[in-house]
Structure formats: C-alpha cells, structure tokens
C-alpha cells in the first residue's frame, strides 16, 4: 500500500484555475464516495478550500492510483487528464506525509502559519470518516497530523503575529486599548480593504461599527452584508466624537480627516483615546494629528513595519516547526512497519491460547475431581508458560518490522509456527469491498 497526495494550490495554479477545481460543500460527500469506488483507491480524503483542492489517498499501486485520481478530478471539473497533471503536484510516501503535515500546520499557506487550514483539514477528515472512505492508515495519520499542528501552534505561537495590513490595523488598536469588545469603530470606505478591516474588527469582538462612504449605497451594501451600521461621509465629524477606532481606506485625493476636524472634536471627547489607522495611499488622514493629546495616528508605513517584524517572527516559528517534521515522518513509518507484524503476533497468540485451552479441556476430562481453585492455578500457570515461550518469538517478529525483507521473513516466521495472518493490504481491500456495498445501499435507499 502507498500514500499519495495530489494537490492543486496557489503555487501550481492561478486563482482563475483554482476557482474551476473547487468542490461545493454539498458535493463533497458524493465526491468522496465516487473516488472511493474507483479502482486502486483503498482510502481517501478530499480537501477543498478557496486556495487548494487536494486528494489524499492510500492506493494499492502508485502509478495506477495516481492516474485514477487525476482522471477523477478531470471528470469532476470538465478537464482533460493532462490539464490536471499540468496544474497539480504529486507527492508520494514520505513526501506526501510531509506535505500533509506542512499543510495542516499552515506552513504551506499563502499566509504563513494561518490556523484556518487546521480546521479545514479536520473537517475534511471527519467528513471522509463519516462517509466511510478512511481506514486504519488515515484514521491514524490524520489524527497525528492534527495533533502535531495543534502542538506546533501552541508551542511556537506562529499565528499570534499579524501579517496582513488589515489584521495589523486591529492589532495596533489592541495595543492601545487591550480588549476591544466594548469599543466603537468607524470604517471609512467600502472596498476590499475596508471589508477585511471590518471582518477583523468583528473578529475581535466589536459589534458597534459604522461604515461611512462618499457613495452611501456602497456603505449601505457593506453594512447590510455584515449586519453593522452605516452613515453618510458628511456625518463623520459627529461620529468621531464618540468613536474609539477609525480605519480608513479610500481612493480620495485629499484628506478625509484633517487636523482641524480632530481639534474641533477633541474638546468634546473628554481626553478619551482615539486610534486613527490610515491604510490608504494616498493618505486619508492628515499627518501630524498624533501631536494632539490621546490621538494615535498610524499610516501604512507604521503597519508595514509591524507586518514585516511579525513575518520575521512567523518565519522563525515556521523553521522551528519544520525541524520537527522529520521526527513525525519517522514515527509514522514506524507505526506503518508494525501494521504487518501485528496480525502475525495476534495469530501466534491465538494459536498458543487455543493450545492452552485444549490442554485445560484435556485436564478437566482426565482429572474431573479438581476443585475450582486448583483449576484456576493450573490455568494460570499454563498461560504463564505460554507467555514465556512467546516472549522471544514476539520480540523477533517486532524486530522484523524494520527489516528490508520483512515480508519474506514474516512469511517464513508464519511457516515455522504454522500460522496464517491476513496482511494489511488484504484487510484494506476487504474493508473497501464491504464499505462500497454500504455506499451503494445508502445511495439506493436515498434514491428511493
């Protein structure tokens, strides 16, 4: 069995292409089932976000599995197989495990170290698990990847430092006020940066937000979308008298907030702090306002300095996380190597315990007068003999797991002890056959 990951992401395809190869949420369960029923696929998880569509699969043969996954993606989105090959990257074995660990921990994201992808990976795994397309390997591997990512984030705090201008703007406000939940905020502008700033303010707990814009219809549209207030730009001076935070991002060619405006409203603010954050170029807020008591004025250069410093911190944290990945891959490989040994050890134990049970039956027949206490003592000691006899063979079987010729030697081991253990590959195939029947029955029932 082999682990393969096929990824269409921000490195391999532009946004126009990525938009065409994204699964709708309501189509993902059927997509999991369709792929699982495909030849060569033994387990699968599909991840589909705005920045990546990925298929993780356990396959019986690498080349066959890769082809059928690429064909599945081509058919799902109306492309040729060669098109999918051109816009995707393929990882196999250790590289596929490394890719999953990097994706889950945010090291492969456009925004380095972001945490949203961890939740998306978890949701994708849970959906696949509930659909029935995961088995022994993915149930273990995805839990390992999720645990690793959580630990990495907690130990390095990689996501704590803002690396987007809109998020950094909110972080600056937090430096002044601490918690923002009870504060009042104004968003000037109704474009993309304004919306991102609005979302970050909402994420910080602020609910009292007013959007103002020269075109009132645009302000109304943005406010309605996120269930906040809106007002005309002419109302700005009055709004400033009670505001705590102002984030401005317009394309105006002259200052929207001037020194004169702030001086007029400062008298009515009773020394309350006001944070002005200007992310527009050219600037919306007149420089020099910071000279007024309790007025904090930041522009894009201030934000860029914070973002650059934070990015350096994230890069250092990412390097620390990357150093931990080889150990995770090694741990996974050790676990995988034991998969073939466990059924052999189980079969050996079952045979030995069957012999012990037969021996006890024989003793019961030949010595019918034994008391219950005597019988328990004999049973205990015969089991002890069995365990002592099995100790060295089991140790040898475990050591075979790391041998390059482990399959051949495990087969010899089984012949010596006259036992027969089902290999993980056969177990996976039988599991798939059973689950495919369940999926088919579920579809028939749903259709009826």
From Swiss-Prot:
NADP(+) binds at residues 189-194. The record marks 99 as: Important for activity. GO terms for biological process: protoporphyrinogen IX biosynthetic process. SUPFAM superfamilies: Glutamyl tRNA-reductase catalytic, N-terminal domain, Glutamyl tRNA-reductase dimerization domain, NAD(P)-binding Rossmann-fold domains. It catalyses: (S)-4-amino-5-oxopentanoate + tRNA(Glu) + NADP(+) = L-glutamyl-tRNA(Glu) + NADPH + H(+). Keywords: NADP, Oxidoreductase, Porphyrin biosynthesis. Pathway: Porphyrin-containing compound metabolism; protoporphyrin-IX biosynthesis; 5-aminolevulinate from L-glutamyl-tRNA(Glu): step 1/2. Substrate binds at residues 49-52, 109, 114-116, 120. Gene3D superfamilies: Glutamyl-tRNA reductase, N-terminal domain, NAD(P)-binding Rossmann-like Domain. GO terms for molecular function: glutamyl-tRNA reductase activity; NADP binding. Its EC number is 1.2.1.70. It holds the Pfam family GlutR_dimer. The active site is at residue 50. HAMAP family: Glu_tRNA_reductase (MF_00087). Belongs to the glutamyl-tRNA reductase family. Catalyzes the NADPH-dependent reduction of glutamyl-tRNA(Glu) to glutamate 1-semialdehyde (GSA). During catalysis, the active site Cys acts as a nucleophile attacking the alpha-carbonyl group of tRNA-bound glutamate with the formation of a thioester intermediate between enzyme and glutamate, and the concomitant release of tRNA(Glu). The thioester intermediate is finally reduced by direct hydride transfer from NADPH, to form the product GSA. Homodimer. This is Glutamyl-tRNA reductase. It comes from Staphylococcus aureus (strain JH9). The gene is hemA.
